[in-house]
Amino acid sequence: MMTKHERTYTTKANFMLHGGDYNPDQWLDRPDILADDIKLMKLSHTNTFSVGIFAWSALEPEEGVYNFEWLDKVIDDIYSIDGRVILATPSGARPAWMSQKYPEVLRVNASRVKQLHGGRHNHCFTSEVYRDKTQQINRLLAERYGNHPALLMWHISNEYSGECHCDKCQHAFRSWLREKYNDDLKALNDAWWGPFWSHTFSDWSQIESPSPYGESMVHGLNLDWRRFVTDQTISFFENEIVPIKELTPNIPITTNFMADTHELIPFQALDYSKFAKHLDVISWDAYPAWHNDWESTADLAMRVGFIDDLYRSLKQQPFLLMESTPSAVNWHPVNKAKRPGMHLLASMQMVAHGSDSVLYFQWRKSRGSSEKFHGAVVDHDNSSENRVFQEVAKVGQTLEKLSDVVGTNRPADVAILYDWESNWAINDAQGFGLETKRYPQTLVQHYRTFWEQDIPVDVITKEKDFSAYKLLIVPMLYLVSEETIARLKSFVAGGGTLVMTYISGLVNEHDLTYMGGWHNDLQEIFGMKPLETDTLYPKDKNYVKYRNQSYELKDYATVLELNTANVEGHYEDDFYANTPALTSHKFENGQAFYIGGRLEDQFHRDFYQELINQLSLEPVVAVKHGRGVSVQVRQASEKDFIFVMNFTEEKQPVAFESLVTDLITGEEINGELTLEKYEVRIVEKTK
């Protein structure tokens, strides 16, 4: 949690970055197009471009034969219009000559089939050849451009993902295991519960990565493999940046994180909490499916806010929106265009939650291949007059007036704990409901009340300092180590308020269950223990009575055994009717609540409202508004920057309690104003 309002600049720029992925290597035979790009950059009010992301074959068309002249001109031309460059390393897609000459760089899938050259992100992270080749090209880039005044940041590779199961990776995995378990095979067998199905190993060489044609049922193995994949990816990244850190130590480094699935949950395949420690700046690629047919615009905006707050909290500093689309993408099931006004609103939401940039994929639509219809600033018409280009220019004009916002953050008294390892483990668990676990979505459900009331939230990982917060919410923390339990206990003992839910605290860091049903320290904190969890069919319902109101329950209901806890709510139906569903417990100087079932949104609003009142949790700036309007604040020592955003399809009245000034128009506002559909107003308030 921030306690002061010092600015943290992600780069040496003191302005909002606006631009995106620029692929001039696709147009080297069209100098007229490249000349048009520079003209259009000025017209679109863009200032920063990520260059070279997939340009390896243009930089090194044959092994040891380099062509940097085109990149020299591109960077010089961008700088000539006072633009800046985020220079990428090209490891995300290697040239064909390399795959042909060095087949060891090709990835092997879990079925042990070696992939052909093609696509992207299909390399072996362990391959010494690929690591050497990557360092070579990166060194040349750093030597040539490290002192160029346009260079703002390094963009290392692109959207790291995937895994390899080749012989080299098997050897690396076994070495990783030997280090983790101190070369003690018995310790590994114990951690993986080896006697199950006679899966005790007698030699390290017998261990293979999970495979549909081999082992997939040993959950300790699966969990350690995912940890290894994260560590090996980070190792590859660290190898990439050796020459860059050596030659350009003052240029910040990032790589672009992602979201997952159409529901925009945190990317699941890599533990970003580990990866974040190796980056100077967090950046991520955001592609919400605006105007979809399964949720309201406000509900989607809330989910965007959650993942923004997670990625911002990874380093407790502003992040960068590295990729977004000016309108439609090309890979959603339905690629709907952003409606007029939505692009500005969506972009300003990212800034409101902590981004110091609005960057796009892509600057110009490619003419061929799979991304030729992906949204871009410049369409195939090469025009500055179409709707999308004009909306991009409006975003740029707005960002030009937000330089004072750059580097600011905001404090939070509320934290929600998100854990990648627990997500892996619960998804692997053969129990509960296979389709209804929905761990990330459950955290968003608990986030809702605070987002609706404009109360800042940090979405933190288990390594963070819990004592910085008044309220810590820990939904569905299936996997929890004794170390984390001890820190939760210390948090409550020190005066904190802890909320935990069903399917929490069931296994340790090896995915082994705690004997006795629940860890003794958890029983002490909560004054009760869970006895069994009832998993409901999709059409099943139960109800919980809380404060004389009935709330619908779906999916899960946990039967609880009281010790010293108080009953705050009870089940109304089934064999556990009239038994505790919600408990509270005073523990030393703090308090702990346990929610036994998955309850409707209105329950969370009412339950958390009591805690909001009790703990004096408040918005940074009070603005009166209805549901569907979000107010987010970024704070400097002398001013608050207030983003008031209408995520509804109707006009919405809002009211300020004190005088504010519109940052874009300079208008002074004292009292009420009306937001149009999808409108955003950005105001400042002097402290």
Regions found by a protein language model. Name each.
Residues 14-18, 45-47, 79-85, 147-152, ...:
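Short, well-ordered coil/turn segments that N-cap beta-strands
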Residues 27-42, 136, 264-275, 339-347:
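Short, acidic/polar
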Residues 35-43, 50-113, 240-247:
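Aromatic-lined substrate-binding rim segments of carbohydrate-active enzymes
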Residues 1-48, 61, 76, 84, ...:
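N-terminal carbohydrate-binding accessory modules
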Residues 20, 41, 49, 78, ...:
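Conserved, mostly hydrophobic/aromatic
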Residues 99-101, 111-306:
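Polysaccharide-binding and catalytic clefts of secreted carbohydrate-active enzymes
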Residues 207, 280, 284-687:
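Carbohydrate-binding surfaces of carbohydrate-active enzymes
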